[in-house]
Amino acid sequence: MNIKIASRNSALALWQTHHIRDLLIAQGHSVEIITMKTKGDVILDTPLAKIGGKGLFTKELENSMLEGSADIAVHSLKDVPTTFPDGLKLACVCSREDVRDAMLSMKYKNLDELPQGAKVGTTSLRRKMQILAHRADLDIISLRGNVNSRIAKLKNGEFDAIILAMAGINRLNLSKEVKFTSAIDTIPAMGQGALGIEAIDKKEILDAIEFLNDEKSVVETTIERDFVHTLNGGCQAPIGINAKLKGDKIEVEAILGLVDGSEILRDSKTYPKLAYKIAGKNFADEFIARGAKELLKRAEEMV
């Protein structure tokens, strides 16, 4: 079968798409790749949360599927909204990479070594919230652009450190580009480290790609995405959520709050694996009972 894949044209997006292409070819399919820029790739002078709207890195890819020029799209799952246009669905969640965030620096080994007032680059309100809760003295600055341009800004001294997803660092072998790479103790974004395959809702396409699903990753990310969906939080909201499947139990921890780290709700819980389809909503409802929606509304007003 010939399968057409829509992809962003960044280095990381193409790595991800080529990875899926190779798996499809190994199953006997032929593959075409259609690359494009998304709104999130084009508008680089504005923090993502200020651009507003959901699907900043997915909408153009979705349009190409709805128009019939592509069958599937490969995404970083953390960028994928929790709702889909009619005719499209999240068809697969692939085996997950490292879910952690990481700090890269040319001078400092880890977050605690950073001097007072150090300039730290990240786009993510979730990362900003958690870092400032730990180190309120740091200067967190919005850092947009592709991975290579971010590392270039670190190397030329614009930043003392930058924060990226460890999965992307591993996939592109970026540790060799900088002196220090260290995982940081933040709760990741929903779906972080996993690739999500969005597809047109056609049986022959869905059947052809079903083998890409990884059960453990599906269980974990279903909880994470249901949690964020119940809170009505977009991909840019300051929400961290991580589910870990261990045997027949799932350990879940989550955090949300104000972007400056001054007010935070955090909790953890263990659910039976069999409850994974309701656990995310139930966990979110507990946060809502503690005022999570009001807190997120205030966080949105701070941006």
UniProtKB/Swiss-Prot annotation:
Reported function: Tetrapolymerization of the monopyrrole PBG into the hydroxymethylbilane pre-uroporphyrinogen in several discrete steps.
Recorded hits in InterPro entries, A to Z, give: HemC (IPR000860), Porphobilin_deaminase_cofac_BS (IPR022419), Porphobilin_deaminase_N (IPR022417), Porphobilinogen_deaminase_C (IPR022418), Porphobilinogen_deaminase_C_sf (IPR036803)
Protein species of origin: Campylobacter fetus subsp. fetus (strain 82-40)
* UniProt-listed GO biological process terms: protoporphyrinogen IX biosynthetic process
Pathway named in the protein's UniProt entry: Porphyrin-containing compound metabolism; protoporphyrin-IX biosynthesis; coproporphyrinogen-III from 5-aminolevulinate: step 2/4
EC primary class? transferase
Provide the assembly information: Monomer.
UniProt cross-references to Pfam families, sorted A to Z: Porphobil_deam (PF01379), Porphobil_deamC (PF03900)
Gene name on record? hemC
Enzyme Commission code(s) on record: 2.5.1.61
Q: Which residues form the signal peptide?
A: none
State the superkingdom.
Bacteria
Gene Ontology cellular component list: cytoplasm
Q: Does the keyword S-adenosyl-L-methionine apply?
A: no
Q: What else is known?
A: The porphobilinogen subunits are added to the dipyrromethane group.
Q: Which residues carry this modification: S-(dipyrrolylmethanemethyl)cysteine?
A: 235
- The answer to whether keyword Transferase applies is yes
Q: What does this protein's record comment on cofactor binding? A: Binds 1 dipyrromethane group covalently.
In Swiss-Prot or TrEMBL terms, this protein is called Porphobilinogen deaminase
Q: Care to name a GO molecular-function term for this sequence?
A: hydroxymethylbilane synthase activity
What high-level taxonomic lineage is stated for the organism? Bacteria, Pseudomonadati, Campylobacterota, Epsilonproteobacteria, Campylobacterales
Keywords of the record: Porphyrin biosynthesis, Transferase
